[in-house]
Regions:
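Alpha-helical transmembrane segments of multi-pass membrane transport proteins
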Residues: 1-168
Length: 168
């Protein structure tokens, strides 16, 4: 260190950081973001919510369940919880208000449903985790699918119980 100085160490750290993040696998992250943008601009998020509302509409609390279902579907398109929550909230919240849903149920449902974007593959954090820990991305996606679906069903069951127990 005294003879060579910090030059070799800083060069090593610089190359290590570049090599870690200049991987082909990381190129999927901007593509997920681009696909989510196309889905939003193309009206897919609204179509997903309308389809989910038509499927779940016959149940009490159906629009809240539809918001969770649409969040899971949109999360599987874009891979981001923040984008999922923002997009589905923009579509579902006005409809839920129009149908007389309470603010607590509406916002709680949309906040919880937005978290599905990180669980249901493709997920940006799962890709980053797989690259940093040198794990198989496909296996991580397969492992995350079941908990994501269980969370979605759990949210929908919680909504069904909530709307029966809490009046209004």
């Amino acid at each position: 260190l005294i003879q060579t100085g910090w030059g070799p160490y800083s060069s090593f750290l610089n190359n290590l950081a570049f090599a870690r993040f200049a991987s082909y696998d990381l190129s999927v992250i901007p593509l997920f973001i681009l696909m989510g943008h196309f889905a939003t601009q193309g009206g897919i998020s609204k179509a997903l919510f309308q389809f989910a509302a038509s499927v779940m509409g016959r149940f009490k609390g159906g629009l809240a369940m539809a918001a969770v279902l649409a969040s899971a579907a949109f999360g599987s398109i874009c891979g981001s919880s923040v984008a999922t929550a923002a997009t589905i909230t923009g579509v579902a919240l006005p409809e839920m208000k129009r149908h007389g849903y309470s603010g607590r149920l509406s916002t709680g449902t949309l906040a919880a449903g937005g978290t599905l974007g990180i669980l249901i593959p493709p997920s940006v954090p799962l890709v980053i985790y797989a690259i940093l820990t040198e794990q198989n991305i496909a296996k991580l996606f397969a492992a995350a699918m079941v908990p994501g679906l269980i969370a979605m069903l759990g949210y929908m069951i919680a909504i069904a119980i909530y709307v029966r127990v809490v009046p209004g």
